[in-house]
């Protein structure tokens, strides 16, 4: 017979008989490869019957405890879950119509893959937000190579941007589409970082005001300037564009100042959309955010648009369409998982399960924080409570008057 066991012994190894039988002098301890180890002392365990369901029971002789040798397949299920989420496969096409897959992956939806802290300084970072509905948006920051961070919020505001940017080292340049609250957050968190407003979004603002088939001469001139804005490649062309834009503002100044009376008696600009586009461009030129990428101090070509992160948003929307029907929290977690798998150093599944928090962990954290806040509010401090001695006397009160 063939021995498929690893042997450890105390004593002298005597001889091998024809390569089949081992004679051991002294005490012999044969440990099978499939033997379970004791969770307390680490010694090998022996088989000790089976449970009512037919599973093998194991017993440790020194500790005299019994246990079941369970195999944790959660990491394998997480890899399967991520492979499905990042693909275009439908659950209906999986074996069994996806019922077994949903049962295996149900606990994995409890995980929250949070973004890591990025201490590496990058030359350029793109920021944008993908809206998942009227009450949720995921803010994303990335480089041309990988995703750096993500943050879920109710809307794009300065507090949400600060929460995202505080975990990332300030870059040399950040390219944005001009989202609400970003400028304020950047001034506080990344004060030394220069901002480049996406020129394509500036063009879209012009196109929205003038339309693609303008009828008015002022709209035609502004739309032509918007098309030229996308092809500015050096400082000389930028100065020429700014000069042409200023000429347009001077020529149509009186036209843009025309006002019309509303039915309620108030006044409004007759060409309000053109006025808004003009004010937006004036602000970008005045703050120097339109042609930051053409600064001669850069030692490498800098991007003028957010095309890189817009491509990421397109892939995220495609993923949500492929797996449409998920509720809001799962759509949010799906975006989180995509960003995490496309980050610089994603961890293996086993490490993710050991480090990433779950819904229960977040609920406990919020509960503990609320309890601490209540205790702090209940316990009085100096100057926020009435002292007993201020309203009472320690000596007895004598009512001796008539």
Predicted stretch roles:
Residues 30-33, 55, 59, 65-69, ...:
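RNase H-like nuclease fold core
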Residues 38-41, 60:
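Short cysteine-rich clusters marking metal-coordination/redox-active sites
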Residues 85-95:
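Short, charged amphipathic recognition helices of the HTH superfamily
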Residues 47-57:
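Short linker/helix segments within small regulatory modules
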Residues 57, 62-64, 68-75, 80-81, ...:
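Acidic/histidine-rich catalytic cores and adjacent linkers
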Residues 1-36:
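A broadly conserved sequence feature marking short terminus-proximal activation segments
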Residues 177-226:
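Conserved beta-strand -> loop -> alpha-helix junction used to position metal-binding or nucleic-acid-contacting
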Residues 43-46, 68:
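Short functional micro-motifs and their immediate structural scaffolds
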